[in-house]
Amino acid sequence: MMMQWKTVRQSVIAALAVTCSFMAGAAPPPVAAPAPAPVSYGVEEDVFHPVRAEHGMVASVDAAATQVGVDVLKQGGNAVDAAVAVGFALAVTHPQAGNLGGGGFMMLRTKDGNVTAIDFREMAPEKATRDMFLDAQGNADSKKSLTSHLASGTPGSVAGFTLALQKYGTMPLDKVIQPAITLARDGFTVNDALAIDLKTYGVETLPNHPTSKAIFWKQDGKPYQKGDKLVQANLAKSLELIAKDGPDAFYKGPIADQIADEMAKNGGLITKADLANYKAVERTPVSGDYRGYQVYSMPPPSSGGIHIVQILNILENFDLHTYGFGSADAMQIMAEAEKYAYADRSEYLGDPDFVKVPWQALTSKAYAKSLAQQIDVNKARPSKEIKPGNLAPYESNQTTHFSVVDKDGNAVAVTYTLNTTFGSGIVAGDTGILMNNQMDDFSAKPGTPNVYGLVGGDANAVGPKKRPLSSMSPTIVVKDGKTWLVTGSPGGSRIITTVLQMVVNTIDYGMNVAEATNAPRFHHQWLPDELRVEKGFSPDTLKLLREKGQNVAVKEAMGSTQSIMIGPDGALYGASDPRSVDDLTAGY
């Protein structure tokens, strides 16, 4: 085990050495990267056509929330105003992942080209300890980290949205939050997505807590179904408090009182001091150049940005366009590149306020070239040669992403979550607010996979005031100095590869945003050693991949991208993912 870890560590150290040698002129000049494919925006001969608008656009997982955002844009609000309005609305209409009691990340590119990242990831409470999720035998106890009051970190969504609005928005908080208040107070019609998730996932946790059951279960003992009206009066009151008193209502006022009381009575750790001390943080985005495009994504504590750039750097050494979309060779190259990135993720990534992340080494072109040289297009490298691991028993797609672009060119990409579907299933007191189970994203025990099958090390160990590692990857791509693609996705460990394929599909294969969204996806996260593919790839291609040594498994759909592309004429082209029901891209 130690030798295997040493091998991974040496790879990063070697990258630094190679980088230095490049700078010293000792290495041969790099081969010119293949050119990107011609860009498509959705012309008549394309199979799938995006939504087109001239002035502003919103893409989200929920039609009602999308319309809230479009209305804000029509009223003269900018992309940040609309994004914050959508974020609060999703907390009402998409409680599977939209939230006030969770956290996430925002990527923002202003009309003048400034790019920034807002980190509103949850934080471990002050009383959190490294071994808090281990049982008497020293093994990780997933019940504690997923469904108990210990599972919740200090929420960040309210702080993140209000910070963004205050610094980059133009509208007052009470105005952008009003649509969410109305939806909660007056009710909305339950759609297919919510009805299915209540029946499939909610039944596991929500009925176990009286305050949760009272909201999402009807008096006949059944969860709300499609077509029912769902009213959330307590959540409306919480939203009204935030509209009136700002984030202090949540972090220092009556909402904080109820959250802290809920935790104190039930063995949770979050205190009023934890809430009062929480701060959203503005960070410098991860950036990279891919075939002449600039890619901006989230820095740690998200692993997404670093590894999207890392994988793209590896892929830049191959002519994917010539191989062709869906070819066995292209999929082989991408799967092998993904293995290396996810291996590094387990060792080096964590909260940058607590651990030193080798950011420059992991995203260097030299390191990527050294990894590319190890990829055999004809033979897969077994993951056990990098590091062994175990398969987690359960996965959830329930994060949510939305993208917004306004008439002036401001662009926002937001991914936020409760972690698993409906989070811990616990509603804090009479707030109507579902609490997250984000503490499971820490490494409860080094080498043991979390709920998404991801293995972590000491860098992501539980610790007071730490933010757990995430895969969330809101991403903005720039072409010729202008915002070109705004994208992101839910999907747990598969977020990184889903967003990666949106970038590759549009740049390397020349797909329009709708084609890139509809194209079948695949994923390799190194452990388990499995190339997971959606339906839609040729059986002959899968046969060739197996012959190359890939452990191919055809499984359910991956991700739910919400993306907007900006054409050279300034027109907006958007697409919501057909893998989700009831989502919507709309503009004006």
Regions found by a protein language model. Name each.
Residues 282, 396-399, 421, 470-472:
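Short, small/polar residue-rich loop motifs at catalytic or cofactor-binding pockets
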Residues 28-67, 71, 79-80, 84-245, ...:
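Noncatalytic scaffold domains of N-terminal-nucleophile
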Residues 466, 508-556:
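Extended C-terminal subregions enriched in glycine
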Residues 36, 318-418, 430-431, 446-447, ...:
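Internal maturation/activation junctions in enzymes
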Residues 80-86, 174-185, 257-260, 325-342, ...:
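Short, well-structured alpha-helical segments that form the helix of a local strand-helix-strand
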Residues 92-117, 269-271, 411-479, 509, ...:
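Active-site rim segments in enzyme catalytic domains, especially the processed small/beta chain
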Residues 2-25:
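Gram-negative bacterial Sec-dependent N-terminal signal peptides
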